[in-house]
Amino acid sequence: MPILVDESYLAKPLGEAIVKSIHGSHKKVLVIGSTDLTHYPSYENAKKVDQDAVEAILSLEPEKIDDMNKHWLGKGIPNLHCTICSEAAVKTVMRIAKSLGADTAVLLKAANSGDVSIGYKDEVVGYAAIALVQEAS
C-alpha cells in the first residue's frame, strides 16, 4: 500500500501506526521508502552532502538527519535545495525498521546524476539504496 508523507513531524506517529498494523496482520512485510537525496548542487558538493546524508541514515537515528540538515543547509551551498528530498519518508521508514528489529543499515549503492556518462555536473540529484535489516544472531 503506497503512503506519501511530506512532513517530518508525522514520521513518529505514522511509523507507530504502521508498526501496529504490521504486528496485527501476522504477515511478513517488506517496507520500502523512496526519496532522492540532494537536489541541484554541483557534482562535488553533492558528493559531500550525500555522503553525510547516507551516514545519517546508516546511523539508524532519525535525529541525525536533523543535525545533518542544519549543518549543510546553513552553509549557503549554491543551488542546494535539500539534503534529503523526503526526509519524512526516510525518518518514517527508519522508525518502522527499528521497531521491527532492524539493528543494521547497509549501503547498497550511492551515486548522483552526474555519475552517468552524459551526466551534467553543474546541477545534480543524489541517490542511494540502503537496506535496514536485522543482523542474524
Predicted regions and their residues:
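Flexible, D/E/H-enriched segments
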Residues: M1-L30, Y40-S137
